[in-house]
A protein has these predicted regions:
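Active-site-adjacent loops and short helices of periplasmic peptidoglycan-processing enzymes
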Residues: 1-134
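Domain-terminus/edge residues, biased toward the C-terminal soluble/receptor-binding domains
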Residues: 110-343
């Protein structure tokens, strides 16, 4: 579905990761002609990137989004490419960005869309994984921000429209959105102790139902708090024995069979994950039935993956614990010579 201005969480985190916040952004004609809601920029006006990020996230200004995109990517099209690359890196497969502001758009490859699950993944990246997560949280938690253009000719002020920040203890971050295609949208995060919950809503009502997103967010957050707790889902895995074709056996016998052990490569003692009572975590082991010599010590030969239904929690590589050499022609020749020499 269309996601409207919730798009701007990706615009913000990309700008934070790619550029310095004190860089000067020069406004283009393309940015100026963006539809409302807008800051009201003027062509060739200059702003600090940091101030435009507050404009982007607090007031959801569409002209600021385009100015940021053009500064970071060189053009809106190139910035959208960066957005899609980052989305793929995060693990999104059904998200497609065309604009940096979330205005309804389509091109030869499809419409500007995402899913609620993938929007939540992007928010998780912004607040928990990105090297700029603290900067992202600082901006999105700020209640108001005043600034001027670089030349100090005009003054501006922005106020945070994320009502969720005042609705629940631990409310952490969020972004609203609305377009005709998207309806009212919201993505927000809450943290209580070690637990972090993210809610993503798409098409959550149309006018006159602006308040639905707040009610639904609170209801879903309360459900998460009441029903989900951290559990250590890590299971101790035994080493796996695998035959090695044409490998030199450990006893060195001419007709002996070589085997090798594979172990899960991790030093982790715990794998904490939020699950509901009654839910079970599945473990999928992918190991070949046979290896081909030579096999160097430490080679990755498979994986052990933890799943909750279709969601991948964690994947660990399986490596071999020793080196197995190949039975070469020279090795056979040497062995035959040794046999005859002993007679």
């Amino acid at each position: 579905k269309a996601m409207a201005s919730t798009t701007k969480i990706m615009t913000c985190i990309l700008a934070l990761e790619q550029r310095e916040i004190k860089e000067v952004v020069t406004v283009s004609e393309n940015a100026v002609r963006q539809l409302r809601v807008h800051l009201g920029m003027q062509i060739k006006e200059k702003f600090y990137l940091e101030d435009l990020l507050y404009s982007l996230m607090l007031e959801s200004h569409n002209d600021s989004a385009v100015a940021i995109a053009e500064h970071v990517g060189g053009s809106v099209k190139e910035f959208a490419k960066m957005m899609n690359e980052k989305a793929a890196e995060i693990g999104c497969q059904k998200t497609y960005f065309i604009t940096p502001n979330g205005l309804d758009a389509s091109d030869e490859n499809g419409k500007h869309t995402t899913t609620a699950e993938e929007l939540a993944k992007i928010m998780r990246y912004c607040i928990q994984i990105s090297p700029q997560k603290e900067s992202f949280l600082k901006i999105t938690q700020t209640q108001s921000h005043a600034f001027t253009d670089v030349d100090k000719k005009r003054q501006f002020s922005c106020n945070n429209h994320n009502a969720f920040l005042g609705m629940m203890d631990g409310a952490l971050s969020g972004k609203t959105g609305f377009t005709g295609d998207a309806g009212y949208c919201y993505v927000g995060a809450l943290r209580r102790g070690e637990r972090t919950f993210i809610v993503a809503l798409l098409g959550c009502g149309w006018p006159n139902n602006k308040g639905y997103k707040w009610k639904d967010t609170k209801k879903l957050m309360e459900y998460g708090l009441q029903n989900y707790e951290y559990h250590n889902v890590l299971k101790k895995q035994k080493n796996i024995t695998i035959p090695v074709k044409n490998g030199v056996p450990s006893n060195g016998e001419l007709f002996g069979e070589a085997v090798i052990e594979g172990r899960v490569k991790t030093n982790a003692k715990r794998l904490p994950f939020l699950i509901r009572q009654g839910e079970t975590v599945d473990i999928k082991t992918e190991i070949p039935t046979m290896l081909q010599a030579p096999v160097p010590k430490g080679k990755v030969i498979g994986s052990v993956t933890y799943f909750l239904k279709d969601f991948q929690i964690q994947r660990y590589p399986v490596i071999v614990t020793e080196t197995i050499k190949e039975k070469t022609f020279l090795w056979y020749l040497k062995k035959i010579f040794e046999l005859y020499a002993l007679k």
